[in-house]
């Protein structure tokens, strides 16, 4: 057990508010999020509220609010969803967005149901999004000077072959620069061709990370054979 040094806590409290605590790089696919305002199947719901979503985007926002500088690599389409994301990025402190605005690609979205018990129903509409076109060329253009950490999830690599290659290149560049790499499996079986490909790919990425972070729901005993197998694989590789 580690004990907290009160002097260190006092020092942290006295740090200037504008001081950057760390620079973290993320890459991902932002989406529009339509949240049901009433119970029932998604096809029966008539009222939704709109928001922005994306696992990596959410992490980037949280980090920026904690005085870390988040460098979020993505690609936004020239459409209402992309424009909404762009405006949200501008509102966040210490949030740096990089990569291109895509005048030809479109941003995708997801629908989230409302429930009184259990997990809500989710429907994805994300094939061929603007962000899925991110390439190794985009990654090679990134200025990683002064960056301390790279955070990767298992979602973006499932979006497209180009996205997977981009993530691999980014992890390779980060390792070469001695950046600390964290990896959140964020299992999304519905995005993969099959279980075998998901297990093989995510396990390969996990082995390149310094820290693997399965979520609480993934770590708990699950009825999903897919999740248990992937988690066992991560545990084995980390041992």
Model segments located where?
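Anion (oxyanion) recognition and catalysis
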Residues: 64, 90, 168, 172-176, ...
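Active-site beta-loop-alpha junctions enriched in small/polar residues
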Residues: 127, 155, 186-190, 217
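Conserved phosphate/ATP/ADP-binding segment of small-molecule kinases
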Residues: 177, 191-239
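Short beta-strand/loop segments at the ligand-binding rim of alpha/beta enzyme cores
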Residues: 178-185
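Glycine-rich phosphate/adenosyl-contacting loop at the front of the ribokinase-like
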Residues: 2-95
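Conserved N-terminal subdomain of the carbohydrate kinase-like
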Residues: 69-154
């Amino acid at each position: 057990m580690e004990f907290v040094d009160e002097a260190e806590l006092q020092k942290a409290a006295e740090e200037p508010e504008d001081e950057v605590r760390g620079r973290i790089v993320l890459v991902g696919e932002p989406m529009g999020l339509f949240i049901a305002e009433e119970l029932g199947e998604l096809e029966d719901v008539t009222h939704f509220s709109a928001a922005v979503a994306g696992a990596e985007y959410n992490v980037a926002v949280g980090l920026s609010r904690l005085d870390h500088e988040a460098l979020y690599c993505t690609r936004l389409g020239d459409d209402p969803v992309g424009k909404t994301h762009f405006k949200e990025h501008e509102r966040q402190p210490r949030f740096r967005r990089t990569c291109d605005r895509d005048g030809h690609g479109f941003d995708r979205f997801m629908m989230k149901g409302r429930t009184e018990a259990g997990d809500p129903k989710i429907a994805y509409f994300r094939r061929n999004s603007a962000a899925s076109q991110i390439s190794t060329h985009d990654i090679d253009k990134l200025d990683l000077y002064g960056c301390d950490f790279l955070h990767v999830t298992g979602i973006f690599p499932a979006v497209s072959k180009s996205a997977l290659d981009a993530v691999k290149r980014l992890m390779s560049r980060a390792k070469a620069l001695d950046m600390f790499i964290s990896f959140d499996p964020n299992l999304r079986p519905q995005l993969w061709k099959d279980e075998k490909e998901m297990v093989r790919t995510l396990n390969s990425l996990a082995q390149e990370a310094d820290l693997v972070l399965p979520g609480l729901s993934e770590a708990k005993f699950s009825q999903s054979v897919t999740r248990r197998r992937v988690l066992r694989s991560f545990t084995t590789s980390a041992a």
